Amino acid sequence: TEEKPFPCSECGKRFARRQHLTDHQSSHTGEKPYACSQCEKYFPHRSNLNRHLKLHKGEKPFPCSQCGKRFPCVSDLNIHRRVHTGERPYSCSECGKCFKHHSNLTNHQRTHTREKPFSCTECGKGFKDRSSLTVHHRTHTGEKPFSCTECGKGFKDRSSLTVHHRTH
């Protein structure tokens, strides 16, 4: 077995490489320093961002045997299978609500703690997740990166564009 001289001070898990420890520690802090330049998503590790970028490139070599939907990596396919099985392995210790994704549980738990760890540098308003902060920040910058293909009107987030599309 490989020697693992780098322990996590938070949970004790040990790693063979310092970089692996550094990557792991973001699971405790919730830090997501790697941003996708094409959309409003952030990731805790460069490998997560690289996997996500495959979506923008259209690389999806792993098909679901039940519905045919394709995925950029096996782990995404395995998570997708929960749609068919109904599995929700992450449960809230406060209220018992269950989630398919750990990140959804983490964001949900902030509704109980009222924690808002992401603050706007312009006005100080706090948010429970980074993507909400990103969208809010556009109210200050005026950025509207989502445009309607029918009329050209711009929107600060994808959901507003989706609602707008229904008017055409």
UniProtKB/Swiss-Prot annotation:
Compartment list = Nucleus
Residue pairs linked by disulfide bridges in the UniProt entry: none
Pfam families documented for this protein:
zf-C2H2, zf-C2H2_4
Instruction: State the UniProt keywords alphabetically.
Output: DNA-binding, Metal-binding, Nucleus, Repeat, Transcription, Transcription regulation, Zinc, Zinc-finger
Q: Where are the zinc fingers (C2H2-type)?
A: 6-28, 34-56, 62-84, 90-112, 118-140, 146-168
What molecular function terms (GO) are annotated for this protein?
A: DNA-binding transcription factor activity, RNA polymerase II-specific; RNA polymerase II cis-regulatory region sequence-specific DNA binding; zinc ion binding
Where is it predominantly found? Answer: nucleus
- State the GO CC annotations: nucleus
**Which PROSITE patterns does this UniProt record tie to the protein?**
ZINC_FINGER_C2H2_1 (PS00028), ZINC_FINGER_C2H2_2 (PS50157)
What is the role of this chain? May be involved in transcriptional regulation.
Q: Which family does it belong to?
A: Belongs to the krueppel C2H2-type zinc-finger protein family.
Q: Which PANTHER family match?
A: C2H2-TYPE DOMAIN-CONTAINING PROTEIN, ZINC FINGER AND SCAN DOMAIN-CONTAINING
Name-wise, this protein is Oocyte zinc finger protein XlCOF19
What organism, scientifically named, is this protein from?
A: Xenopus laevis (African clawed frog)
